[in-house]
Amino acid sequence: MEKQIYLRKSIRRYRGNDIGEAALSVLASWRGWADVYAQGADADCDIQLLGSDAKLGGMYFIKAPRYIAYWGRPTREGRINAGFILEQISLKLTELGVGTCYLGATHISGANPDERGLEPIIIMSCGNPAEPLTRTSTSEFKRKRLDKICDAELNEKMRVILESARLAPSAMNRQPWQFAIEGGRIICCVEYSGLDAFRRLSEIDMGIVMSHILLTARAQCGAAHIEHSQQDALKAPRGTGYVATIVTENL
């Protein structure tokens, strides 16, 4: 999956045929291979696979053979978990030749919380692409420079890890993340908006970017895990809120 970080792009045009059995199997078995960010009740979630006839509404809609609806807790941790899991699914589907696109302004018409209190958090379209599936170069990404999201001195491995973070997709390409480095600790922080809608989307974005960091840190260092540290929260860059710390080993 990690290699797809440097290739994936949002796909907005799809062929009419359904995704193949390999992709359907990946979606059915996601609990067996995807990492989870949240703990406890906030980790409670479901993935619902919808067809092209799904009743969807919202300001921004893409016609696709399939839609992936993430149901989770309507909390900060629940939204971070949504981005964290869905980005892994997106990268895995890209490996299989299936395109995806986050639909942050799309919702399931008439959906209500289920008996566990889970709600649709975000929807992703997916299908066989009717346009190029991947980028040919990282120069095609429209992203902030690395020194705009982290002003620390970086060794080669840490530079590779944060480059994967730099390339992460985000709602309206806002890229609301900032990072501080303490040894092998990557302190992940968010630039919050005053608007609730942007705040919620930024939390999903933080799940996406942290999935990139964790995947790449494990590829570079062999092991990495997520922690929450009050001490690290004090090191958040000015104007940001602390989210979590990704601890790398063998850096």
Regions found by a protein language model. Name each.
Residues 1-251:
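Acidic, surface-exposed loops and disordered segments
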